[in-house]
């Protein structure tokens, strides 16, 4: 490592206050005599203290701990028959981008190497506006209805009494949502602790839509395959790393980019014709399900490379704001309930965290012209469009709507009601069963051991509940988890009749 000062190239400058006035003394406070009290007229002390207590902004409710980098996306294959989005308009086209990778459940001070999902958020600065793809390193999630998302957050965060993470709360919640078993199986598998952000895949997870110049709609899933190869950590390896370095993932990403070892991912899509959504044997908009790659194979699109670290972490990573509602012509949403809720909730979270004008922060600012009647608000710094009219319609030919970019109509029918997913699709186990059966014996044993370790001191009735769910998924799955927990499947099946949650819909 070089011993040279990293700022040796900068010319000496003078320290000023926030208003530009010179700071005469930055070492000693203004006092009445050498041993007297402070004076209220010490303007620089007042400013430093006032700014200091306001430096921390609200942390993200989820995905609080993260790392980021800038890069470039390059199109390598033609998909214009599926989408009119200009980011994909020609082979060889390059688009600047920013990526943020995260843990999910932990706070800003959490260790990078914890067993957890990893966030995989990408912002593409396209000529038609910013496109945000806000995904994870897993293709599925615990939930399929957003009503339970705040509850998930509370279950995996700190207990309101002890202020500690609670295996009881966590597993009580998961085991009463049988649809969560698919994601639980992923998180408790070897892939539950990636060795680094560079060595994991990414997924859009949700079903999105494409539409082309002819107005044809296709449903789409996004997959990002790491070109560095998959590498994971065992619980023991992760514990050793955490004991010495809580920023292991951030350090790995930053140092790789600094030495010119730029990480890359290949983008693939799965494409489903619009009409197929009513024909497939599974719910194509269910976030707890994946699509068959046999029926809808991966189609290569391009690759992205991360090649520039932020100059200031707070400015670019902490203030980066991602929202699935940041879409561009040719890329749209779907009836996925979880996605529908995120279309509002994510942008609203950024308004709370960063203010209504968060899009003016450089890392979030579109690279294309922005002509909007949205005005004023705290932190407006772009001139606020001066004296231009801020209403529409107006008589001055200003900023007309663009009907050529309208999304094709989507046929929707049905009565408005609180429709229960379980009445529509109660196949909780076929896909986690398929995943389990893809594992070799060693991987299955890791799954059993990791599950037992994660369940920790949760009460037996919760452990029995999870054993039952695993048993109904696959007998060998249930048997393996039971043995790792020092319990039996037989006792778990008997324990159902005395489960405290008896009568709840999620108790199977």
Swiss-Prot record:
Any single GO CC term annotated in Swiss-Prot or TrEMBL for this entry: cytoplasm
Reactions that this protein is recorded to catalyse: 2 H2O2 = O2 + 2 H2O
MF-aspect GO terms: catalase activity; heme binding; metal ion binding
Protein name from the UniProt record: Catalase
GO biological process, one term: hydrogen peroxide catabolic process
Induction section of the entry: By hydrogen peroxide.
UniProt cross-references to Pfam families, sorted A to Z: Catalase, Catalase-rel
UniProt-listed CDD domains: catalase_clade_3
Keyword list, A-Z: Cytoplasm, Heme, Hydrogen peroxide, Iron, Metal-binding, Oxidoreductase, Peroxidase
Main location: cytoplasm
Binding annotation for heme: 346
Function of the protein: Decomposes hydrogen peroxide into water and oxygen; serves to protect cells from the toxic effects of hydrogen peroxide.
Subunit structure of this chain's protein: Homohexamer.
Active site: 63, 136
Enzyme Commission (EC) number: 1.11.1.6
């Amino acid at each position: 490592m070089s011993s040279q000062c990293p700022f040796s190239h900068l010319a000496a400058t003078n320290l000023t206050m926030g208003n530009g006035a010179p700071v005469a003394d930055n070492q000693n406070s203004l006092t009445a005599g050498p041993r007297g009290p402070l004076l209220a007229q010490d303007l620089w002390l007042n400013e430093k203290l006032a700014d200091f207590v306001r430096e921390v902004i609200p942390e993200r409710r989820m995905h609080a701990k993260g790392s980021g980098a800038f890069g470039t996306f390059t199109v390598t294959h033609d998909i214009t028959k599926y989408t009119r989005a200009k980011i994909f308009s020609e082979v060889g086209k390059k688009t600047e981008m920013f990526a943020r990778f995260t843990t999910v459940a932990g706070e800003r001070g959490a260790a990078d190497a914890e067993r957890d999902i990893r966030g995989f958020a990408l912002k593409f600065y396209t000529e038609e506006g910013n496109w945000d793809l806000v995904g994870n390193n897993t293709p599925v999630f615990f939930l399929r209805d957003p009503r339970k998302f705040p509850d998930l957050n509370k279950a995996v965060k700190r207990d309101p009494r002890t202020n500690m993470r609670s295996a009881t709360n966590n597993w009580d919640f998961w085991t009463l949502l049988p649809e969560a078993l698919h994601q639980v199986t992923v998180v408790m598998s070897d892939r539950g602790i990636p060795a680094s952000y560079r060595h994991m895949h990414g997924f859009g997870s949700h079903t999105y839509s494409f539409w082309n110049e002819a107005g044809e709609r296709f449903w789409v899933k996004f997959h990002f395959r790491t070109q560095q190869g998959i590498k994971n950590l065992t619980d023991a390896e992760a514990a050793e790393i955490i004991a010495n370095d809580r920023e292991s993932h951030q350090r790995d990403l930053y140092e790789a980019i600094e030495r010119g070892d730029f990480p890359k991912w290949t983008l693939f899509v799965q494409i489903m014709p619009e009409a197929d959504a009513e024909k497939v044997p599974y719910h194509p908009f269910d976030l707890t399900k994946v699509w068959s790659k046999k029926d809808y194979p991966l189609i290569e699109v391009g690759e992205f490379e991360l090649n520039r670290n932020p100059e200031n972490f707070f400015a670019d990573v902490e203030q980066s704001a991602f929202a699935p509602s940041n879409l561009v012509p040719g890329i749209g949403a779907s009836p996925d309930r979880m996605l529908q809720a995120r279309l509002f909730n994510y942008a609203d979270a950024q308004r709370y965290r960063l203010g209504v004008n968060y899009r003016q922060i450089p890392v979030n600012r579109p690279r294309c012209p922005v002509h909007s009647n949205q005005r004023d608000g705290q932190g407006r710094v772009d001139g606020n469009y001066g004296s231009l009219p801020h209403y529409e319609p107006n008589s001055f030919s200003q900023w007309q709507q663009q009907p050529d970019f309208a999304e094709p109509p989507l046929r929707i029918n049905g009565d408005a009601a609180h429709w229960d997913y379980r009445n529509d699709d109660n196949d909780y186990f076929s896909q986690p069963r398929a995943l389990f059966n893809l594992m070799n014996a060693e991987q299955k044993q890791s799954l059993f051991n990791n599950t037992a370790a994660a369940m920790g001191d949760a009460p037996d009735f919760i452990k029995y509940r999870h054993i039952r769910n695993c048993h109904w998924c696959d007998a060998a799955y249930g048997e393996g988890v039971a043995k790792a927990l020092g319990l039996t499947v037989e006792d778990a099946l008997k324990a159902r009749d005395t489960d405290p949650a008896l009568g709840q819909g999620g108790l199977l």
